[in-house]
UniProtKB/Swiss-Prot annotation:
Domain of life per record: Bacteria
Keywords tagged on the record: Chaperone, Periplasm, Protein transport, Signal, Transport
Keyword Thylakoid attributed: no
Organism listed in the record: Edwardsiella ictaluri (strain 93-146)
Entries under PANTHER family matching the protein: OUTER-MEMBRANE LIPOPROTEIN CARRIER PROTEIN
GO cellular component: outer membrane-bounded periplasmic space
Quaternary structure annotation from Swiss-Prot or TrEMBL: Monomer.
Stated family: Belongs to the LolA family.
Function: Participates in the translocation of lipoproteins from the inner membrane to the outer membrane. Only forms a complex with a lipoprotein if the residue after the N-terminal Cys is not an aspartate (The Asp acts as a targeting signal to indicate that the lipoprotein should stay in the inner membrane).
Segment forming the signal sequence: 1-21
Protein name per Swiss-Prot or TrEMBL: Outer-membrane lipoprotein carrier protein
Compartment(s) where it occurs, according to its Swiss-Prot or TrEMBL record: Periplasm
Keyword Protein transport applies: yes
An annotated GO BP: lipoprotein transport
Length: 204
């Protein structure tokens, strides 16, 4: 009888812990297991009816919470770098660089959500979980996202993520060859190339 009582208490405790572990906290916990990584990715953009309109590929480097380098290689090259204070966006085709303060950057974009992994950002979404897949629906109708989905393994490896905008356009990113570990600090530094136009919005 005593053993049965102990067993029941253990099972009850396990069930309580399961209930307390919300999808949102589970997602944050998984992402927190990997603080820095490098991966390549593919991108597919499609219209609301599923018609593909763009495919691309690139690489990204992340060091949470505020350092990242997102390098879109094709179809058109672009670079988005955060050095922890400034967010740099470089478009080689138009030879222009835009600089803004990172703390002014919106937290309602998929990449910012993943790299910052800030509880205040996740709190703006209703989060549901199905295995290793997490669906996030904004609580505010003013959000430019309609739905955000991310697949994260228990060890923190990100398989991919997708975003559906209010007009139904869907962007799907599949991550490949994620390598966890230290990232060269140079990846998070950016100096505008000579001759490009600098739109410095930090002065506004």
């Amino acid at each position: 009888m005593k053993k049965l009582l102990v067993a029941c208490c253990v099972v009850s405790g396990m069930m309580s812990a399961s209930v307390l572990a919300s999808p949102s906290s589970d997602l944050q916990g998984r992402l927190n297991k990997v603080n820095s990584f490098h991966a390549s990715f593919t991108q597919t953009v499609s219209t609301a009816d599923g018609t593909p309109v763009q495919q691309g590929e690139g690489e990204l480097w992340v060091k949470r919470p505020n350092l990242f380098n997102w390098h879109m290689i094709s179809p058109d090259e672009s670079v988005l770098v955060s050095d922890g204070k400034t967010l740099w966006f470089y478009n080689p085709f138009v030879e222009q660089v835009t600089a803004t303060w990172l703390n002014r950057a919106t937290g309602n974009t998929p990449f910012m959500l993943i790299t910052r992994n800030d509880a205040s950002d996740w709190a703006q979404y209703n989060v549901t979980q199905q295995g290793n897949t997490f669906d996030l629906v904004p609580k505010s109708a003013k959000n430019n996202l309609k739905k955000f989905t991310i697949s994260v393994m228990p060890d923190g490896t990100i398989n991919g993520f997708s975003a559906v905008e209010q007009d139904g356009q869907r962007s799907v990113y599949t991550l490949k060859r994620q390598q966890n570990g230290a990232v060269d600090a140079a990846k998070f530094r950016f100096t505008p190339p000579p001759g490009v136009t600098l739109d410095d919005q930090r002065q506004q």
